[in-house]
Amino acid sequence: MRTLPPPLPPRSRPRRLVVSTVAAAALAITTAVALPQSAGAAETSPIGFGAGTTGGGGASAVTVSTLAAFKTAVTGNTAKVVRVSGLISLTGQVDIGSNTTVLGVGSSSGFTGGGLRLKEVTNVVIRNLNISKPVAPSDGVTVQKSTKVWIDHNSFSADRDHDKDYYDGLLDINHGSDNVTVSWNTFKDHFKGSLAGHSDNNASEDTGHLKITYHHNHFSNVYSRIPSLRFGTGHFYDNYVEGADTAVHSRMGAQMLVENNVFRTTKIAVTTNRSSDVDGYANLRGNDLGGAATEVSQVGSFTSAPYGYSAEPASSVVASVTSGAGAGKL
């Protein structure tokens, strides 16, 4: 395969190396961490690449329970906090304006049948929502040409009773979006988890962008794209993945730092050499692979995140994530 120069300092491409489960475990580096996040302790602001995202901030909240009222409430770029009460059926996606917080009420509010779209906006928080069965071509949440986004404590789900293309992605981030944190969410029963970077042919728009942090998420019975990242820089830490075929996928020169995650009943925990003409890069440390294999053809230069964070050891991740991730856990 040809090699795309990495977004961080260039390096010569190493010979392809497929790392076995045993070798990966032996090479795992124990990361130095501060105090671990306590289970379910919801942050008041995002950690990671999405740091500084405030959404509607301290704006007075409005509560809606119908689709018409929701569409009106999230329109425009003035600061706003919109509370969703109950489950609203969609047949497509609703566009969300800049400087918006969308917050579910209780543990069972949200949307089904479609999703939310963040297109050419900035400073948006999506929190405490149930988002289910986004019928194609709608994603559960689409982040497109947008910056400063926090996706936190939501429950995304579909089913695997239909063809893999019947539903679209649960969370897709594309078209040069940047500075995104995805934290404390559950992703369940789907073929396609989170696609970051939609096409091998979109280097001109995506290179230097798609900086995304995924932490403390639970992926259960999700076949692949956990996440799939092209061109960008991804930090995937303290996540719990079970029942996947292919989990973390770095491609088209993307840089992935994968640390302190737990994988169970998963075939391939990390791959850098599938499905694209250009391999990605990955660094692994402190992970509990649980018997999963890794396919790391290129070790990357992204070894240290450019922000402060407290990663907990893999030994406590399952307890923290299963008790703290998803809607209704704020």
Name these PLM-found stretches.
Residues 1-41:
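Secretory targeting and sorting signals
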Residues 42-58, 96-98, 160-164, 188-192, ...:
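Post-signal peptide N-terminal regions of Sec-secreted extracellular proteins
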Residues 47-83:
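Acidic Gly/Asp/Thr-rich repetitive segments characteristic of extracellular carbohydrate-active
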Residues 71-78, 86-103, 109-128, 132-147, ...:
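Extracellular beta-strand-rich solenoid/capping regions of secreted or surface-exposed proteins
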Residues 93-96, 110, 114-120, 138-145, ...:
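Glycine-rich beta-solenoid repeat tracts in large extracellular/virion proteins
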Residues 99-105, 122-133, 145-161, 177-198, ...:
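Right-handed parallel beta-helix
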Residues 228-231, 238-241, 245-330:
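Extracellular beta-rich repeat passengers
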